[in-house]
């Protein structure tokens, strides 16, 4: 098991710590080629110093292009709340011509920890119905 690090923007950081995003996509280069299942990646928030998310690689898939990527994986797992077109446009803006010249790697990951633990509260359907009824009464 080896450890690697990448920089991410604050939106991606928030998606990761909230467990909405569990696939990170990169252009296949020497570093991303070397990362294997079981390796650890620390994603550092480039917008806020000291904020990070640590994950373990559960699966690694290499595809030939962004269209194959969007066929294999749900957009919501890569870019929550956005469309296929928005993901493709973002990748074109980030990688430019490289996007058409190199393969793409998708890292499916398991969340390990972050700089500050976030507590998640899960509600069952009954509770949600009770809340809806309460809101209607207000």
Model regions and ranges:
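Intrinsic-disorder/low-complexity, polar/charged segments enriched in Ser/Thr/Lys/Arg/Asp/Glu/Gln
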Residues: 1-3, 40, 52, 104
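A mature extracytoplasmic/lumenal domain signature
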Residues: 47, 59, 111-113
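Short, charged beta-turn/beta-strand-edge "cap" motif at the junction between a beta-strand
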Residues: 30, 45-50
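Beta-strand secondary-structure signal
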Residues: 5, 56, 106-108
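Short beta-strand-centered aromatic/proline hotspots
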Residues: 39, 50-62
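Contiguous surface segments at macromolecular interaction interfaces
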Residues: 67-138
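Compositionally biased, charged N-terminal/linker segments
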Residues: 1-37, 124-138
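Short conserved beta-strand and strand-loop elements enriched in small hydrophobics
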Residues: 38-46
């Amino acid at each position: 098991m080896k450890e690697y690090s990448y920089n991410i923007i604050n939106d991606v950081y928030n998606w990761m710590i909230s467990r909405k995003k569990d696939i990170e996509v990169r252009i296949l280069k020497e570093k991303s080629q070397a990362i294997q299942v079981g390796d650890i990646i620390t994603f550092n928030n480039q917008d806020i110093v000291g904020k990070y998310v640590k994950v373990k690689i559960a699966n690694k898939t290499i595809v030939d292009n962004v269209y194959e990527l969007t066929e294999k994986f749900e957009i919501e797992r890569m870019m929550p709340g956005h469309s296929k077109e928005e993901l493709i446009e973002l990748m074109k803006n980030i990688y430019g011509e490289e996007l058409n010249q190199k393969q793409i790697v998708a890292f499916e990951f398991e969340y390990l920890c972050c700089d500050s633990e976030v507590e998640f509260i899960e509600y069952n359907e009954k509770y949600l119905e009770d809340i809806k009824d309460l809101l209607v009464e207000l």
